[in-house]
């Protein structure tokens, strides 16, 4: 009788493990909250033309929010939400994760091939870190990502966006266009910092920006993107009259939104796209 009870307990435990592996587990509590992109890393050994630049302002500063009900973000172009997310653990080192999901690498790879080094990320020296993918009600989060040569999983590929937690405040996120993002958790008391002194805010739009962590982050991104455009124009000897005029016209257009947050956000997104298109020569 005692042996039968033990057998049933073992069987039940095995069932729970299998079910968790198939269905996933709730989001880890450590993940819940808002995270902000602090760094945008590219493969420094790749010669291909990329959509994004190193620390691209369209991605740097963006916010990812993780809750038990939904994962959302305000990253450029791909705001895809993940409803009712479940986490699926991945048992691998950061190097292995990158080899199995990013393009441009063979898998298995020679020992001297190190995408962690190529992307200039802090190396975990082969240690296993906590990593997982997310499943949503509509399928895998960012499920179109992954190696194009992973037919029938021959390369043990990891599709979709994956998360690797370096610690409880820092994560690596595999993102679009073979980009790696470094995010930090946003403290609940994080100060709001715009590109201008909020004490000198004079319009309703500026006051709205200074009252929103998200809008202030976009404001900083636009200021950085504009600075890059000016530097590029100076370096190439291009006239800056049009660039300066366009920025002034945009500020006027932005301020026409008043305190309407969605209007301001839309105006900021468009300006970021315009500045990026200009820097790419299109």
What are these regions (language model features)?
Residues 37, 71-75, 170-174:
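Short hydrophobic/aromatic-rich beta-strand segments that constitute the beta-sheet cores
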Residues 32-33, 59-62:
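A glycine-biased structural micro-motif
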Residues 25, 40, 60, 79-81, ...:
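N-terminal alpha-helical modules
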Residues 2-10:
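Bacterial N-terminal signal peptides that target proteins for export
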Residues 27-51:
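Tryptophan-anchored aromatic micro-motifs
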Residues 41-44, 66-156, 241-244, 252-256:
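Contiguous, well-ordered beta-strand patches that form the walls/edges
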Residues 19-20:
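N-terminal signal peptide c-region/cleavage motif recognized by signal peptidases
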Residues 158-160, 166-169, 177:
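Residue-level recognition of beta-strand termini and adjacent short loop/turns
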């Amino acid at each position: 009788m005692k042996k039968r009870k033990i057998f049933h307990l073992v069987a039940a435990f095995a069932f729970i493990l299998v079910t968790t592996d198939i269905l996933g587990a709730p989001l880890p509590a450590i993940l819940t909250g808002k995270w902000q992109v602090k760094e945008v890393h590219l493969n420094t050994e790749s010669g291909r033309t990329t959509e994004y630049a190193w620390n691209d302002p369209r991605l740097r500063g963006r916010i990812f929010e993780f809750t038990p009900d939904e994962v959302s973000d305000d990253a450029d172009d791909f705001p895809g939400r993940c409803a009712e997310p479940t986490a699926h653990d991945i048992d691998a080192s950061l190097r292995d994760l990158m080899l199995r999901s990013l393009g441009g690498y063979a898998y298995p790879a020679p020992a001297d091939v190190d995408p962690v080094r190529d992307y200039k990320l802090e190396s975990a020296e082969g240690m296993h870190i906590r990593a997982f993918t997310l499943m949503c009600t509509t399928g895998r989060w960012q499920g179109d990502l992954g190696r194009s040569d992973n037919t029938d999983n021959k390369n043990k590929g990891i599709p979709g966006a994956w998360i690797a937690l370096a610690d409880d405040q820092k994560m690596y996120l595999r993102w679009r266009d073979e980009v790696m993002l470094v995010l930090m958790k946003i403290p609940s008391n994080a100060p709001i910092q715009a590109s201008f002194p909020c004490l000198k805010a004079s319009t309703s739009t500026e006051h709205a920006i200074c009252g929103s962590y998200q809008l202030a982050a976009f404001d900083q991104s636009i200021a950085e993107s504009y600075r890059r455009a000016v530097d590029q124009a100076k370096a190439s000897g291009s006239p800056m009259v049009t660039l300066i005029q366009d920025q002034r016209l945009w500020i006027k257009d932005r301020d026409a939104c008043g305190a309407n947050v969605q209007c301001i956000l839309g105006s900021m997104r468009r300006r970021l796209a315009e500045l990026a298109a200009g820097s790419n020569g299109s």
